[in-house]
């Protein structure tokens, strides 16, 4: 399970060092893809393959399905962390997420999300009031 907030830096070669606590779960390979809200999603390879099978089951005769499949799979990059836990973020993915040196990596249960640090703070600021309402909708009576 991926949890927490981390602040690694993107180096000049477009590499990001994954938080040490996640490296074992990602040692078998990972997939980096465009996420929602202009962040990147990082899935363990097995998790992504399971999701991809579900996406592949959708009827490709449906134009929306084809469009989504193209968007998802064309924007996905397979990576293997190096000995120092670094992964290379493809230029197109860096552009999409607006990644600069300052990044934020958050745990989101079954995936990591990589954010531009300023965008992440803006997202938090803009959604703070929505959190209480969403909590009640997602987990009524739990908190």
Swiss-Prot record:
<dbReference type="InterPro" id="IPR037914">
    <property type="entry name" value="SpoVT-AbrB_sf"/>
</dbReference>
<dbReference type="InterPro" id="IPR035642">
    <property type="entry name" value="MraZ_N"/>
</dbReference>
<protein>
    <recommendedName>
        <fullName>Transcriptional regulator MraZ</fullName>
    </recommendedName>
</protein>
<dbReference type="GO" id="GO:0009295">
    <property type="term" value="C:nucleoid"/>
</dbReference>
<dbReference type="GO" id="GO:0000976">
    <property type="term" value="F:transcription cis-regulatory region binding"/>
</dbReference>
<keyword id="KW-0677">Repeat</keyword>
<feature type="domain" description="SpoVT-AbrB 1">
    <location>
        <begin position="5"/>
        <end position="47"/>
    </location>
</feature>
<feature type="domain" description="SpoVT-AbrB 2">
    <location>
        <begin position="76"/>
        <end position="119"/>
    </location>
</feature>
<comment type="subunit">
    <text>Forms oligomers.</text>
</comment>
<dbReference type="GO" id="GO:2000143">
    <property type="term" value="P:negative regulation of DNA-templated transcription initiation"/>
</dbReference>
<dbReference type="InterPro" id="IPR007159">
    <property type="entry name" value="SpoVT-AbrB_dom"/>
</dbReference>
<keyword id="KW-0805">Transcription regulation</keyword>
<dbReference type="InterPro" id="IPR035644">
    <property type="entry name" value="MraZ_C"/>
</dbReference>
<keyword id="KW-0804">Transcription</keyword>
<dbReference type="InterPro" id="IPR003444">
    <property type="entry name" value="MraZ"/>
</dbReference>
<dbReference type="GO" id="GO:0005737">
    <property type="term" value="C:cytoplasm"/>
</dbReference>
<keyword id="KW-0238">DNA-binding</keyword>
<keyword id="KW-0963">Cytoplasm</keyword>
<dbReference type="InterPro" id="IPR038619">
    <property type="entry name" value="MraZ_sf"/>
</dbReference>
<comment type="similarity">
    <text>Belongs to the MraZ family.</text>
</comment>
<dbReference type="Pfam" id="PF02381">
    <property type="entry name" value="MraZ"/>
</dbReference>
<dbReference type="InterPro" id="IPR020603">
    <property type="entry name" value="MraZ_dom"/>
</dbReference>
<dbReference type="GO" id="GO:0003700">
    <property type="term" value="F:DNA-binding transcription factor activity"/>
</dbReference>
């Amino acid at each position: 399970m991926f949890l927490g907030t981390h602040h690694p830096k993107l180096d000049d070669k477009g590499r990001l060092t994954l938080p040490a606590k996640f490296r074992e779960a990602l040692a078998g390979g990972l997939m980096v893809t465009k996420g929602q809200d202009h962040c990147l999603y990082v899935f363990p390879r097995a998790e992504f393959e399971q999701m991809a099978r579900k996406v592949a089951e959708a009827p490709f005769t449906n134009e929306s399905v084809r469009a989504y499949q193209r968007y998802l799979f064309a924007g996905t990059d397979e990576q293997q962390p190096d000995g120092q836990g670094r992964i290379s973020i493809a230029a197109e993915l860096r552009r999409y997420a607006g990644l600069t040196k300052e990044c934020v990596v958050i745990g989101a249960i079954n995936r990591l999300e990589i954010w531009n640090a300023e965008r992440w703070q803006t997202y938090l600021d803009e959604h703070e009031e929505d959190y209480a309402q969403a909590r009640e909708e997602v987990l009524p009576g739990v908190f």
